[in-house]
Amino acid sequence: FTAGRHIGAMVSTEQEHWSLAGGVFGDSLTATNGAAHDQDEGWGLGARATFAPINEKTQVVHLGLGLNYRDTGGLGTTSFKQQPETHIGGINIADTGTISNVTDFYKVGAEVAIIMGPFSAQTEYIATSVSRNTATDLDFDGWYAQAGYFLTGESRNYKNGSFGSIKPKASVGEGGIGAWELAIRYSTLDLIDKDIDGGDVDSYTLGVNWFATPTLRFSANYVDVLNVNGGTYDNQEPSLFQVRSQWAF
């Protein structure tokens, strides 16, 4: 439901309490063959501004606003879909399918985040408006809210309008147990409007993150879809458990 990856150019600037970025983008990275590859996918604009009235080492208040505009060009179609809080499930529990006769669409997102020592919370809302040349325009939206707490006392790292990697107070291999975080998340997505029934989904996630070292992380998440209204998976309530290991260098 968020903006995908496209080839383009972007410029950005930042100071201690604010950041600003904007870019112009062309074709997507995913259309590598078939009809979509031979057609003009249009062009897009993207911009994001952030402001942190409080930006201390362990105390942060973050505000952000983003805008994404997309002209569909010769393709004239678009679609929106989402897996249930995972990238490996292979099932889009909310999916509009192909929306035809689309001239352009835009997305507006607002974000708020705070850090208070070992506690952090953030929320984001995204609204999408789709313009069609032979049918009524469409509106979709979604939002999430999440919170986390470090049992070992660390704080999330924040710089230039985004969160960075976690540095444990005492890493594994250096006499410590790393950084341990408990997390919770709630999200909702509504892809139903007019003649499009892509589904309305609500779900929550419980998670544990273990940062063994500054470059090694392990995560475990339990996701429960509370309900699906409409769409292909109407009235379904799936749940899943997923683990992840990550080495960054």
Identify the meaning behind each predicted range.
Residues G76-F249:
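Outer-membrane beta-barrel pore domains
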Residues F1-A9, Q15, L63, L67-T72, ...:
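Outer-membrane beta-barrel translocator/channel fold
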Residues V61-D71, A179-Y186:
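Extended hydrophobic secondary-structure segments that form protein cores and membrane-embedded regions
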Residues F1-K57, G64, L75-V102, Y106-K107, ...:
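Surface-exposed coil loops of outer-membrane beta-barrel proteins
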Residues G23-G26, N68, I126, V223:
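Active-site-proximal beta-strand/loop segments in catalytic clefts of secreted hydrolases
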Residues H17, S28, N55, D71, ...:
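Short loop/turn segments at secondary-structure transitions that flank enzyme active sites
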